[in-house]
């Protein structure tokens, strides 16, 4: 028996989950927020308890020290050496990493170089990796890449219709993201349907603050909505999703607050989507509250959101030439029944129908009617468990 930590590190946060392996039992979980800012928050959940402390945490190394000390302080572990592995979620692996790998200096260097593909994610992941290597240098450290699952896409799918020199010289192509989540829920869908994954055509919809949809053919990703970066695809919480690229130079010319392309991309990443259109929030719960109040901006944001998701799902029916099931997962996918109802309501032509008694908050499983030709499933994603499993698998390959 051993203990493994799954880590999802951002620029100012560190989310973690501690497992007893190979039993896959969750021993504790938590998050450290506002790293590098005043009044950082460290939250630990274990044995039905929740402990929270506010303190100043200056960097990721300090955050990891506090996390490990908390595990000892709360009696979750007796000593550091009980932890034998750590797995790190890394958003962008580019073409270099087609599967999870054990960390070494070269791997870490590549992750930092690939930050251009995920500027909001990879730098934080690299900081988390460095912190654990500094404090626990002897344990197995593994990187699990969001992009790995999508390396099965065909060249005609991942290339953009621009001169090929931009791919050969600069590696401009579709990479996708959320691959760990899409892979996991596809496997769970096969179990739920009682059929081999290798026989199924699935559309998996990861709908959280970030949104990505994937066409899964016989267990492999054949297309996905996120692209060169996680900015592409349907509308998201704070991200615009797909827009006409000519808008970028136009806005630079017209708006004095947007001085260059970086300013526009920052706006598209952090100030757009549900939040930007509604002027209220990136949280679907707040948007739905706005619907109840007949707030016109909330209504508009919601309608754009539903429209973009329906269009993306619809195109993947064409990519797969039909599908056996549609899977909803992640924060909104799992917990927003109104959103699911309105998405499916625009896709009934494909033979989908949901049971309103099952399409309720908190329900997991098959929410379609017996007559539905395409099954509609709600499955909780578990990226942390996937990460812990890969650590366990790779422990003896250092």
Swiss-Prot record:
Disulphide connectivity of cysteines: none
Keyword Magnesium carried by entry: yes
Biological processes annotated in GO: acetate metabolic process; acetyl-CoA biosynthetic process
Enzyme Commission number: 2.7.2.1
Residues binding ATP, per UniProt: 15, 206-210, 283-285, 331-335
Residues that hold Mg(2+) according to the record: 8, 383
GO cellular component, one term: cytoplasm
Site positions per UniProt: Transition state stabilizer: 178, 239
Biochemical pathway: Metabolic intermediate biosynthesis; acetyl-CoA biosynthesis; acetyl-CoA from acetate: step 1/2
Role description: Catalyzes the formation of acetyl phosphate from acetate and ATP. Can also catalyze the reverse reaction.
Family that this chain belongs to: Belongs to the acetokinase family.
HAMAP family linked to this entry: Acetate_kinase
Protein name: Acetate kinase
Origin species: Streptococcus pyogenes serotype M2 (strain MGAS10270)
Lineage: Bacteria, Bacillati, Bacillota, Bacilli, Lactobacillales
